[in-house]
Every structure is written in structure tokens, then in C-alpha cells.
Amino acid sequence: MASCAARGPAELSKAQAVRRIGILGGTFDPVHIGHLRSALEVAEFMGLDELRLLPNARPPHRDTPQVAAQDRLAMVREAVQGVACLSVDARELERDKPSYTIDTLESIRAELSGHDQLFLVLGWDAFCGLPAWHRWEELLQHCHILVLQRPDADVEPPDELRNLLAARSESDPTAMSGPAGNISFVWQTPLAVSATQIRQLLASGKSVRFLVPDAVLAYIEAHELYRAPN
């Protein structure tokens, strides 16, 4: 798989020894340009070898997805087709239990070398909600955390996260070293699009062209997804 950032000859031996893998989870109900733009910007800025979009099965802190897991997975696969360094990881959909991020991180970490860097990409709201996550204090044992910044964020982090940021924050995300253990912030292009908005438009019979990739729109139309009940 092609890396998101070209490396010069001086970096070749390091690139061979240490892989840089990012994961971006979500229900992707459906996947849209906001998800994809954030993923690509992070991958390119961080020079990741791979950024995996990881569809959630039954996320404990989210509403049940509107369409079946196989449809959401298929749409994500359509969305990243031909995009260098973006890929799909379906492991959470293969579990017959709630999707806990700590389990996923442990599973992925077991497949990597001890030197490989793993980056968990989170939106600001998700990051502020970390203290409600299962075994959240263990996350940084397995990965670095990259928090997507946006100018309209209006959620304040709880005290537990303020303390964690004071101890583990790195001002330059590209300077994070080691396989895991730090938190940093990455700017994202603000795009006012959401899966909820897209579902509402589709249910009302309106077009979502240019809000989702053409291949995803074709899949939605072919399978008659997100239509209002008759």
C-alpha cells in the first residue's frame, strides 16, 4: 500500500523499520466527504503508511446504525477505492459483542511490531467523552491519540482529560515518538456535513450528491437505503 507521504533516501531505513498506522472509527451511516477529508488530511499531514477506516458494529455510546453492517462496510470500501493509503478494517463488524475501542487497539497492536506507531484519530466531542469509554485509561498504552480540531468546538473537556493533557500532550503531532503514549491536535478543514443530515435529506427524497462520493451514492440508490417508510 502506498504511503501518504513520500520519504527521501535518508528516511528509507526508518520507514522500513517503523510503520505508522492510523485508525478512524465510526458508524459511517453513511460515510461522507467529511469523514474522508479528515482521514486524508491526517494521513498526509502525519505521513502515515496507512489510515484505516474502521466501521463500528454496535458502538456502546452511539445510537444503533440505521442500515445493516454489511451495507455500511460496502459503502466505506467503495469510498476508499483507489485512494492511496486509505483502507478499511472490518474487525469490529466480525465481533458478536459491543465494539470497545480498547479491544480493537489490543488486537491491532498484536499484529504490529513493538516499534510501530499506532494513532487513534478522534473528533473533539468523542475525545471529551473518553472518560465514559470502557477501560479508557489504558488507551495510551497502545496508541497515540490525534484529536481533530475544529473552530466551532463548544464542548469543554472534563477534569480527567485536563489532567491527562497536562501530562501527555505534545504540541507538534509530527514530533510524537515511540509506539504510543501521547496526545496531540491536528487541524481539519471544517466541512458542515453530517451523516444525520444526509439521512434526513435521503428520507425526504432530496439529493445528497457532492456530500458523499459518487460510488457511495450509487450504492445507496441501488440498494434503496435511507428511504422513508411507505
Curated annotation (Swiss-Prot):
Family assignment from sequence similarity: Belongs to the NadD family.
GO biological process: NAD biosynthetic process
Pfam families referenced in this protein's UniProt entry, alphabetically: CTP_transf_like (PF01467)
Name of the protein: Probable nicotinate-nucleotide adenylyltransferase
Source organism per UniProt: Pseudomonas putida (strain ATCC 47054 / DSM 6125 / CFBP 8728 / NCIMB 11950 / KT2440)
Protein keywords: ATP-binding, NAD, Nucleotide-binding, Nucleotidyltransferase, Pyridine nucleotide biosynthesis, Transferase
Keyword match Lipoprotein: no
Catalyzed reactions: nicotinate beta-D-ribonucleotide + ATP + H(+) = deamido-NAD(+) + diphosphate
PANTHER family noted in UniProt: NICOTINATE-NUCLEOTIDE ADENYLYLTRANSFERASE-RELATED, PHOSPHOPANTETHEINE ADENYLYLTRANSFERASE
UniProt enzyme class: transferase
Role: Catalyzes the reversible adenylation of nicotinate mononucleotide (NaMN) to nicotinic acid adenine dinucleotide (NaAD).
Gene (UniProt): nadD
Enzyme Commission (EC) number: 2.7.7.18
UniProt cross-references to SUPFAM superfamilies, sorted A to Z: Nucleotidylyl transferase
Cited InterPro entries: Cyt_trans-like, NadD/NMNAT, Rossmann-like_a/b/a_fold
One MF annotation (Gene Ontology) recorded for this entry: ATP binding
Pathway recorded for this protein: Cofactor biosynthesis; NAD(+) biosynthesis; deamido-NAD(+) from nicotinate D-ribonucleotide: step 1/1
